[in-house]
């Protein structure tokens, strides 16, 4: 018979194994694997008081991936408590391959968001890792004009061996059925793109609206640093 300590360790390992992805940076609002399929923010509806200073000029998003292939997108909601209004796309849906550490580099805040230093917002990462729909995790941020140092970028941006990204033709939302992917893949460096309205996307779970395209990567693939 297992001791209480062994049972606790076993339960912890089971929880970790069943998680589909974990948002490591910026600091996540909260995580509960049983609620991670709840929109918005994996069931954590209340903004955190522990906000991450996020440079207007761009910063990485660090994920811990628990699948070998996942569709991912990144959206932004503006304000102290955006509720379900995540109406700015920071990264359109792309395919990530490889487990463990995955970094999206240079996630920029588009000028169309009209954010300035000291204003609050929330980043939401969406994936298709759940058989019944999407998975959602959020990070509450405060905008800053101060860029990250090289050491800070290195601390918050790591890719495991073999991790790649791939563009998706006609991408919808990451929580939808996968579309066929294009042949472009690899470790593309990021570039800025002008924000444009996108009305063709299907609703993100129960929410729908006009999305503005923020920073995009070369060839449609996510940036790896």
What role is predicted for each listed range?
Residues 1-2, 24, 169, 201:
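Selective for proline/serine-rich intrinsically disordered segments
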Residues 8, 17-18, 180, 190, ...:
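Intrinsically disordered, low-complexity repeat segments enriched in small/polar residues
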Residues 3-4, 83, 121-123, 203-205, ...:
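Mixed-charge, polar/low-complexity N-terminal
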Residues 1-4, 225:
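Positively charged n-region of N-terminal signal peptides that target proteins for export
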Residues 194-225:
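Cleavable C-terminal sorting propeptides in eukaryotic secreted/cell-surface proteins
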Residues 13-193:
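Mature extracellular/extracytoplasmic regions of secreted and cell-surface glycoproteins
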